[in-house]
């Protein structure tokens, strides 16, 4: 009887020990495998360029920043000078001051606009050094976010009709994608003239 009791106790002790070891190993196994943290995969440059090209199209950047040639349905972007900005030189015509208090005037290429602010000319956004070829990504984002010429803190404000307050609502990734695409565009060597003050345009 005593032997039977002793054997039973030994069996129970061994069983408890085995279960305890198994649970400890399982616990160690769980500690060895920390929960995986999901991270956002950064966009590749190729995917950024592709998205940037799409955004430039749907945002209508060619409407003002690409000079036009006459096509069968009217003015259309000149494929040889895409995003090269205003090319025709500064405004020389005198305008009626009463007219520009009511209307904004555009040239046929829609790269120049005249209004109460004077005459503004669409910037060269091509990859040429006379465009944004020498710009940094930070400059480009600052230009859009803050409405500053060339993204410089002490730069002049961007003038109408540039809709920078709307574009500023794009995400950082959107703006980085646009910049990546613009850096791949055909370079258009074209120095855009500075804005013309209103007093130089008004008929005396």
Q: Model segments located where?
A:
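Gly/Gly-Pro-rich "capping" loops immediately C-terminal to redox-active cysteine motifs
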Residues: 70-142, 158-171, 201-204
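C-terminal motif of bacterial Sec signal peptides marking the signal peptidase cleavage site
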Residues: 17-20
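Bacterial signal peptide processing site
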Residues: 22-24
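Electrostatic cytochrome c docking/interface patches
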Residues: 32-57, 69-75, 91-95, 134
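Bacterial N-terminal signal peptides that target proteins for export
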Residues: 1-9
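Interaction-mediating elements
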Residues: 49, 62, 155, 161-163, ...
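The canonical Cys-X-X-Cys-His
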Residues: 52, 58-68, 140, 178, ...
